[in-house]
Design a protein with these regions (language model features):
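Conserved small/polar residues in nucleotide/adenosyl-binding loops
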Residues: 330-333
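Canonical AAA+ ATPase core
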Residues: 116-119, 156-231, 238-244, 296-298
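Conserved AAA+/SF3 P-loop NTPase catalytic/coupling segment centered on the Walker-B
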Residues: 131-154, 186-191, 208-211
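Basic, amphipathic alpha-helical bundle interface domains used for macromolecular binding and assembly
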Residues: 220-328
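Pre-Walker A (pre-P-loop) alpha-helix and adjacent loop at the N terminus of AAA/AAA+ ATPase modules
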Residues: 36-69, 75
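Loop/turn-to-beta-strand initiation segments
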Residues: 68-69, 131-132, 169-175
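Walker A/P-loop
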Residues: 65-100
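Conserved alpha-helical scaffold flanking the Walker A/P-loop in AAA+ ATPase domains
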Residues: 116-134
Length: 333
């Protein structure tokens, strides 16, 4: 599949200038440069606490700037909690962590009304989901009812407590983790909820060099404090989100994205039969929307006011891996 008719073109002929995109004012060079400086400040501070894990950093930045949520899959001990809290501190945002368990109730997440016998009135206590950055640890251990409450908060950016609706703070980023090894006592995330995550990334082990650097910093005391001073403000993040929505996407790239998503639904038109039959359901139109969001944020992170085919390709695995449903092994045998 090629981007329009240009094959593997990634050069500066993208985008074709002067074509309207209906997105409002274009980004000027000064705004792009300022965005690059803000992203570099966040990245530098993040890297001071989280050694290696460039792919994780990219996923978190794309999720934050693209206005989406991120699903993290990895074994324990790969700095997911540290990464989430560091990102929140870096952008002067509130942070909360929820350890998901089977007995976790929706009210434990979104909050509840508490009766005050002295005054005879109810007061509302907001739950931990009412933070700028929320880490849902082992989300697949929570019950379906609790997952549904999380879904409302993630998708609608609001939570209903009693008869009143409370908006989530802005910016609002949910990071959810899954352990691929220990699946006993877990609840499979419904596809509808998986689809609400902008990205899914698999956090890998650090390289030997990164692990040595981690130990070196640990011995020197550089990692003793888990907090970092903020280097940008929440208002800066909201500005970056607005800027991301103004990143230019050429018409040919929109067709390229739709071609990719279409290929997941009609694998027989693009893949050998033995491979095509392994995929039961392809990606929904929400995947195409996620591609645009992620590619725009990825372009802005790299200091550009327009999306290149490379941005789309860089996001392809993170956007698609949780949206494709393979055929059950029993159906293949």
């Amino acid at each position: 599949m090629s981007a329009g008719t240009t094959g593997q073109t990634t050069g500066e002929e993208w985008p074709r200038r002067g074509e309207p995109d209906g997105r409002g004012p274009r980004i000027d060079p000064g705004e792009a440069a300022q965005a690059r400086r803000l992203v570099e400040a966040i990245s530098h501070t993040f890297d001071s606490k989280v050694v290696g894990q460039e792919a994780l950093r990219t996923a978190l930045l794309v999720g934050l700037i693209g206005g989406g949520h991120v699903l993290l899959e990895s074994v324990p001990g790969l700095a997911k909690t540290l990464a989430a809290s560091t990102l929140a501190s870096t952008v002067d945002a509130s942070f909360s962590r929820v350890q998901c368990t089977p007995d976790l109730l929706p009210s434990d997440i979104i909050g509840t009304q508490v009766f005050n016998p002295g005054s005879g009135t109810f007061t509302t206590e907001l739950g931990p989901v009412h933070a700028n950055v929320v880490l849902l640890d082992e989300i697949n251990r929570s019950s379906a009812k609790t997952q549904a409450a999380m879904l409302e908060a993630m998708q609608e950016k609001q939570a209903t407590i009693g008869a009143k609706t409370y908006p989530m703070p802005n910016p609002f980023l949910v990071l959810a983790t899954q352990n691929p090894i220990d699946e006993e006592g877990t609840y499979v995330l419904p596809q509808a909820q998986m689809d609400r995550f902008l990205l899914k990334t698999i956090v890998d082990y650090p390289s030997p060099a990164d692990e040595v650097e981690m130990l070196r910093r640990l011995k020197s005391g550089a990692l003793e404090s888990r907090t970092v001073p903020p280097v940008v403000s929440r208002q800066d993040v909201l500005w970056l989100q607005d800027l991301s929505r103004r990143v230019y996407v050429d018409e040919a790239l929109l067709r390229y994205i739709v071609q990719i998503v279409h290929a997941t639904r009609h694998g027989g038109d693009y893949l050998p039969q033995e491979q095509a039959r392994c995929l039961e359901y392809g990606a929904s139109p929400r995947a195409a929307i996620a591609f645009v969001q992620a590619a725009c944020a990825h372009a802005l992170i790299h200091g550009r006011d327009h999306v290149l085919p490379d941005d789309v390709r860089a996001m392809r695995y993170m956007v698609l891996r949780h949206r494709l449903i393979p055929v059950s092994y029993t159906h293949l045998t």
